[in-house]
Regions:
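Lipid-exposed faces of alpha-helical membrane segments in multi-pass integral membrane proteins
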Residues: 11-20, 37-40, 75-78, 97-104, ...
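Transmembrane alpha-helical segments that form the membrane-embedded catalytic/substrate-channel core
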Residues: 45, 100-115, 163-178
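Short, amphipathic, aromatic/basic-enriched membrane-interface segments that mark the entry/exit
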Residues: 1-10, 61-70, 123-130, 180-183
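Multi-pass membrane catalytic core of lipid/isoprenoid biosynthesis enzymes
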Residues: 8-13, 54-110
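C-terminal membrane-associated helical module and adjoining short loops/tails
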Residues: 120-188
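Topogenic membrane-insertion module of multi-pass membrane proteins
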Residues: 1-49, 168-188
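Cytosolic, membrane-interface loops and tails of multi-pass inner-membrane proteins
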Residues: 47-63, 110-126
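Helix-coil boundary and interhelical linker segments in multi-pass alpha-helical membrane proteins
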Residues: 21-36, 75-97, 142-159
Length: 188
């Protein structure tokens, strides 16, 4: 079989399946279910790299991990939020398509940049250029929660937030990468 199936990529695969469940939830009109899946995908993405770093991997396994993570991110943090917003406001189709395109470009840029970075150093990444697409796992759930709390309309504010977020994906400002201390995780 093509691909890699060790524990270093399993959480990425799980995150993708959770994201796909979120797309189905959004298409079925279950906004809360879609938001919860978006958050679940975000949790999987938060830890998949840390888990992968615990294993000595071949260069092919490392490159596969980068690619599969970005493909999963496109579905979970590009397509899922776009479907979620489109379901709440069907007049936002072009905006949602543009958001997915911006997420795709941002992820492709990251992959090229990460490959070049890894050719020069094995140090951990300290910053990103442009807003990482994974921030969608925080932005849209917070927006949804605020709208529930203040009884506002997700269908009105979500497209505006989506436009700003998509623009931030491609704007070359620097974002410091949060680092959490890795305790009790040994290399295998």
């Amino acid at each position: 079989m093509l691909g890699f199936y060790n524990y270093t990529v399993i959480l990425t695969y799980i995150g993708l399946l959770v994201g796909f469940g979120g797309i189905l939830s959004a298409m079925g009109g279950n906004t809360l279910g879609a938001i919860l899946c978006l958050m679940g995908s975000g949790l999987c993405d938060m830890f998949d790299g840390k888990i992968a770093a615990t294993m000595e991997r071949t260069p092919s396994e490392k490159q596969f991990g980068i690619q599969i993570d970005s493909l999963s991110d496109l579905v979970c943090f590009g397509v899922l939020p776009a479907v979620l917003v489109y379901q709440s406001n069907e007049h936002s189709a072009w905006l949602c398509g543009g958001y997915v395109l911006c997420a795709l470009i941002r992820l492709a840029w990251f992959n090229v940049d990460e490959q070049a970075r890894q050719e020069h150093t094995q140090e951990r990444r300290r910053e990103y250029r442009g807003l990482p697409v994974t921030t969608a796992a925080l932005i849209f759930p917070v927006l949804f929660g605020l709208e529930q709390f203040f009884s506002l309309s997700f269908s009105v504010s979500a497209p505006v937030v989506m436009l700003v977020t998509a623009s931030a994906f491609l704007t070359p400002f620097r974002v410091k990468k949060p680092h959490f201390e890795r305790r009790n995780m040994k290399r295998l």
